[in-house]
């Protein structure tokens, strides 16, 4: 049956050709698929997670950087304040040290030479002629000599308290001077330079003597008499002649007062 064989052959050849074409297309598709990586669900999830996590990390880094800069600025301000305080304290300390040093040098340079030192309170005790009851003195109520003798002076002070004298009346003043001549109360006269020229009783104690010695006898009779020296400026003879009548009377200016006993030979009374 040659008639149907022709159409069948043609159909068969067409099918074979179609199959070859289909095979070629499938191989191309397979090559394309193998060369191109198609993302799977897992890779997509990882990509999304990475993208999601990268966003907040950048924000955190920016916040941390800002906080660090603010912290550094605060630290710088604190350091500036501390530096200012340090300079102030250091400057004050240096200024105080210099002031103290200048004061010490000044006091050392102005200190009078010799072994005697100023002691105003002791000078008041030495010069005070006022009794405990408030007696008067030739120096007037406003003078330092007219001040009250402290309580317990005789028992606590190393200086001998001189006899209380009342200079209100001229007769009493003359009598007091006579008593001093006969009872000089262990007051010794020296030259103004402080050297012991002649040891004798000074009858003019309190009346222009430039330097006097106060004696103090210890409670123990075996102990020698201790002497304390005090130096005064001399007054003019006219001022010392009649203290009660002198309008220009002034207390002898204290120059020096001994702070320690001095060694002297016994006074020679005439």
Swiss-Prot record:
Start-end of Low complexity biased regions: 33-43, 133-147
Composition skew (Polar residues), residue ranges: 44-62
Localization in the cell: Virion membrane
Keyword Coiled coil: no
Region spans: Disordered: 33-62, 129-179
Keywords from the named record: Membrane, Signal, Transmembrane, Transmembrane helix, Viral envelope protein, Virion
KW Electron transport (keyword) present: no
UniProt-listed Pfam families: gpUL132 (PF11359)
Signal peptide: 1-27
The organism's place on the tree of life at top rank: Viruses
Coiled-coil parts of chain: none
Location, primary (coarse class): virion
InterPro entries (UniProt xref): UL132 (IPR021023)
Membrane-spanning segments: 84-104
A single GO cellular-component term on record: virion membrane
Topology relative to the membrane: Single-pass membrane protein
Sequence similarity: Belongs to the HHV-5 UL132 family.
Name of the featured protein: Envelope glycoprotein UL132
